[in-house]
Regions:
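Short, aromatic- and cysteine-enriched interfacial helices/patches
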Residues: 2, 18-22, 340, 371
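Bacterial Sec-dependent N-terminal signal peptides
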Residues: 2-9
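N-terminal non-catalytic accessory region
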Residues: 15-17, 21, 30-236, 393-435
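Helical cap/lid subdomain of alpha/beta-hydrolase-fold lipid enzymes
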Residues: 177, 181-435
């Protein structure tokens, strides 16, 4: 009896995968924090106190993934949080342990470029400037929201640690590249058209990041995004969110206001929905859906490079088991929301990509395939991806505590994982702060 999937079954799996991904917000987990949305900009957390009060000299900033939300901006309030779920409160817990740690707020569905720019302004403060050339190229507004600034003194010599979960790791890599090398497109556009240009696009800003740590990041893309498709999933998810959550009374910020997905004060709901239908968002590749594909990520990998002054480290899990003919199947203890995508990834043509955490293949989460890597040891190394051992039985959400049904990974194990990572940051500073 052949176990080869029929085209009809493959299509059915893809349709089910689309439904599951939409329902479960999957290219990373959904945040549902309780902080009032009105506090997001004013109480953007995170005033940096005197370093002598903390274990870490350089502030630690956590960057959420696709369809992730910072405190108070998510679609469902009162039922957990992105960083720790119901198991930990990573921001509060680690501040109590003596660490200077913050959570960034960037677009839930935006492209890595847009999210990287937002992350820059989240840290530095000011009104988001996506760049005149970028805005003209893709057809969205040049300016976005205004951030209060979590670390206004951030500049060369004043470093930070960046930790990204899922797509957050890609976003961090893009920001680092912009800091060092800027945007030649923006520089050229300004030369031709005049006007102002953000310091971010001029480049030359090194010695600002101490370490980059990625957790379950699809450095080489995810077949889940490939199979779902860019346009269909955007229409299904973003339009529904925009229609239901982008109205004037909603606290939800999906991070697509630059595309017009926010109702204006003088606009009726009917007028808003009609305007949304005309947005160029529906046909663009300037969004997170495309950037998570293997094609979109390949572009990112060839745009970015390793900084010899930064400590890089990756963490990746797996929660699949061998199936027929070399396939991989979701483990019985995997979060049920990931099982369809896990099984779909587990059948892709290239066997090296089949083992996965429900959303990201192990081979994708370890390091960008075109960049230098080595096995992580106790020695602090810079300018190379230090790959930690694969964490077996850990699915995509286990790292951030959002799998409420998890029985094999205890709260203590999760806390140990984060304890070790934060202690690692402090050890890194003994090397990186000498620069």
């Amino acid at each position: 009896l052949s176990t080869k999937e029929s085209p009809e079954n493959e299509k059915d799996d893809s349709r089910k995968g689309i439904k599951a991904l939409t329902k479960n917000s999957q290219a990373t987990t959904r945040n549902t924090a309780t902080t009032e949305a009105s506090k997001e900009l004013k109480d953007q957390t995170n005033k940096v106190a005197s370093q002598k009060e903390y274990k870490n000299h350089d502030p630690i900033i956590l960057v959420h993934g696709f369809n992730g939300y910072a405190s108070g901006t998510g679609p469902i309030t009162g039922k957990g949080n992105y960083w720790g779920g119901d198991r930990l409160k990573i921001i509060q817990d680690y501040r109590a342990k003596g660490y200077n740690v913050m959570e960034a707020s960037v677009s839930a569905f935006g492209s890595n470029y847009d999210r990287a720019v937002e992350l820059y302004y989240y840290i530095k403060g000011g009104r988001v400037d996506y760049g005149a050339a970028h805005a003209a190229k893709y057809g969205h507004e040049r300016y976005g929201k205004t951030y209060a600034g979590a670390y206004k003194d951030w500049k060369p010599g004043q470093k930070i640690h960046l930790i990204g979960h899922s797509m957050g790791g890609q976003t961090i890599r893009y920001l680092e590249e912009l800091l060092r090398h800027g945007s030649p497109e923006e520089v050229e556009y300004q030369k031709q058209h005049g006007g102002d240009i953000s310091p971010l696009y001029k480049g030359g800003q090194d010695n600002m990041i101490s370490s980059i740590t990625t957790i379950a990041t699809p450095h080489n893309g995810t077949h889940a995004a490939d199979l779902l498709g860019n346009e269909e999933i955007i229409r299904q998810v973003a339009y529904d969110y925009a229609r239901s959550k982008g109205n004037k009374l909603s606290h939800v910020d999906v991070g697509l206001s630059q595309w017009g997905l926010k109702q204006r004060e003088d606009e009726t709901l009917a007028q808003y929905i009609q305007r949304v239908k005309q947005s160029k968002l529906w046909t663009t590749k300037d969004n997170g859906f495309y950037d998570l594909t293997t094609e979109g990520t390949d572009i990112l990998n060839h745009k970015t490079s390793l900084n010899p002054n930064i400590v890089y480290k990756t963490y990746q899990g797996e929660s699949t088991r061998p199936g027929p003919n070399g396939t991989q199947k979701a483990d019985v203890n995997m979060n049920i929301g990931y099982t369809l995508t896990a099984n779909t990834i587990g059948k892709v043509k290239d066997k090296a990509w089949r083992e996965n955490d429900g959303l990201v293949s192990v081979i994708s989460g370890q390091y960008p395939l075109n960049q230098a890597h080595t096995s992580a040891t106790d020695q602090v190394q810079k300018g190379v991806w230090q790959v930690t051992p694969v964490k077996h039985n850990w699915d995509h959400g286990d790292f951030v505590g959002t799998d409420t049904s998890e029985v094999r990974i205890s709260k203590e194990e999760l806390e140990d994982f984060w304890d070790n990572m934060f202690e690692d940051m402090v050890r890194n500073e003994k090397v990186t702060d000498k620069q």
